[in-house]
Amino acid sequence: MSKRSKACDISPKVKKKVWERDNHCCIICGSPYAMPNAHYIARSQGGLGIEQNIVTLCMRCHNDYDNGNSRVSTGYKIQWYLKSCYENWNEKDLIYKKEMINK
């Protein structure tokens, strides 16, 4: 596994923290049938598997965010939510950079 892939993976520890932070439900629709595995900044764009970049979404909302017409509006909702959870939240801190991994 590459360093980037490892950095973008979501660890069980992060999933647990996000699940608790998100009150065990989808942050968009409130469904309890959800999982803490949605990247705000996509893995394909270098989005890290850190709690500041991960949210709990149900399958429908996750699919709409990844593939649907509501990507922009859902993205704004996720962004607002994460900003409300983390005082110094910044999108730039959510993206993999080679220099962040110990050499």
Whereabouts are the PLM-identified features?
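Polybasic, low-complexity binding patches
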Residues: 2-6, 44-55, 63-103
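Short, well-ordered helical secondary-structure segments
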Residues: 25-27, 41, 76
